[in-house]
Amino acid sequence: MEHGLPDPLGAGRVLVTGAGGQLGAALREVFLEADARTRADLDVTEPIELGYRPSLVLHAAAWTDVDGAESNEEAALEANVRGTRYVAALGAPLVYFSSDYVFDGAKREPYVESDDPAPLSAYGRTKLLGEREIREGWIVRSSWLFGWTGHNFVRTMLRLGAERDEVRVVADQRGSPTYVGHLAVATRELLSRPHGVWHLAADGDCTWADLAAAVFEEAGLDCRVTPISTEELGRPAPRPAYSVLRSEREGAPRLPHWRDGLRECLARLGA
């Protein structure tokens, strides 16, 4: 899979799956020419009939409920593995969006593409199995996505920060919060690079508690962050304590710092 396309955007149509999600919404703005399909008009868990063969597929449709996958792994498998298999069967080069949660968090320096995956959770396992369905294209691992639509940490903190004086947020997990707008731009740049696994995540890293505090500071909200442990939070799915991503590959697109992404996102939200 270590090769590239002369010009995947040069002919034919680009298909975006999962266009109703936060990443899909960002991809729609960068790939204006795309046939952007939401779950309502393209269910990837069933064999796909488009009526045309796309020149490129940006596969953003996925099961993203990390905790829900622990109790319903079959549904997560259906979306993240079987769905990816059906999309790959279209025969077009594919960009598959994977996750930092394919790693176990045992390292204390950024994970690079050559590191061996070892997922802790059902969600992480399904994303890794989805990677293995890709025969032609790019596997993009990113981290802690947030954007102006959908359910994500930044939007949740904005709401809680306006409602409360204090929030309790996990401080023993560290990652690279990545703005979907920046990831979409980097994805377009990636199309001129060889196929294979690429780590595309924001520059810098922080804890969830750090990110919450930054949201409140940037948005001018008077809300205190009380750091807690993952154990205290008591979520069903295990999560890596450290899942910062960096690319070791020559010519890897560079994303802006996570704080810059946060400012852009908050401006988009009018916060």
Spans of model-derived segments:
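N-terminal Rossmann NAD(P)H-binding glycine-rich loop of SDR-like oxidoreductase domains
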Residues: 4-32
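SDR active-site strand-loop-helix element
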Residues: 17, 37, 60-61, 94-100, ...
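Conserved C-terminal active-site "lid" loop/helix of NAD(P)H-dependent oxidoreductases
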Residues: 48, 207-213, 228-271
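NAD(P)H-binding glycine-rich loop region in Rossmannoid oxidoreductase-like domains
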Residues: 48-79
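Catalytic helix-loop patch of NAD(P)-dependent Rossmann-fold dehydrogenases
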Residues: 71, 78-83, 102-140, 144-147
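NAD(P)-dependent short-chain dehydrogenase/reductase
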Residues: 132-175, 181-182
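Mid/C-terminal beta-alpha module of Rossmann-like enzyme folds, strongest
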Residues: 186, 192-236
